[in-house]
Design a protein with these regions (language model features):
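Structural motif
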Residues: 3-7, 29-32, 57-59, 78-82, ...
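Generic hydrophobic/aromatic pocket-lining and core-packing "Φ" positions
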Residues: 19-20, 90, 131
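NTP/phosphate- and nucleic-acid-binding module
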Residues: 25, 49, 53, 58-61, ...
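Long, hydrophobic N-terminal alpha-helical segment
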Residues: 2-57
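Short gly/pro/ser/thr-enriched loop/turn and capping motifs at secondary-structure boundaries
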Residues: 39-41, 66-67, 110-113
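Ordered, amphipathic secondary-structure segments that act as subunit-interaction surfaces
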Residues: 59-106
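A general structural motif
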Residues: 10-13, 62, 123
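Glycine-rich, aromatic-bearing surface loops/beta-hairpins
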Residues: 96, 101-165
Length: 165
């Protein structure tokens, strides 16, 4: 079972800020990326693995495979940093029975129909609804760009999307 675990949404996945600040904040020895699309793409998997230090264990799993691995050994006997590219994969994992009680929201690029919610984090209405639904189901979800920042609640989502509840 993971000794210590942190779960984060950041569409950049494994990058400098994750490696220099977040991974060191929990002294992570393993990064688990959960993403159906990337788990099937050998080139993108290799790019993510090359981005990490040589001594860092990296797993890139589909949601279904993540549930299997979790049920088998809770991602191993390591301090684990779990990364998602978007909120839909968190919901999919929850629907499959893998629930993470605390989720930090980092960068989600402000593109297409996304509106800026918090710093470099954008959501569209469907993503906002998904997050609020997950919160209603008991998950603790918060905005926090770097470990030294204060955790911010999802209240600002309701201000940007007043029709979402």
């Amino acid at each position: 079972m993971a000794k210590k675990m942190m779960v984060r949404v950041d569409d950049r996945l494994i990058h400098g800020q994750v490696l220099t600040q977040w991974v060191s904040a929990i002294n992570a020895q393993k990064i688990v990326v959960i993403d159906d699309e990337i788990s099937k793409d050998k080139m993108r998997k290799n790019i993510l693995k090359f981005a990490a230090p040589d001594d860092m264990k990296i797993s890139i799993l589909s949601a279904e495979r993540a549930v299997e691995v979790w049920n088998k050994n809770k991602f191993g006997n390591f301090n684990v940093f779990v990364l998602f590219r978007d909120v839909n994969m968190i919901k999919k994992c929850k629907d499959l029975g893998l629930v993470f009680p605390d989720i930090s929201l980092g960068q989600m690029s402000i593109i297409d129909d996304r509106k800026q919610i918090y710093r470099q984090l954008g959501l569209n209405e469907a993503e906002a609804q998904t997050l609020l639904d997950l919160e209603k189901d008991g998950l603790n979800i918060y905005f926090q760009m770097i470990p030294t920042d204060k955790k911010e609640s999802l209240e600002m989502v309701k201000k940007v999307f007043p029709n979402v509840a």
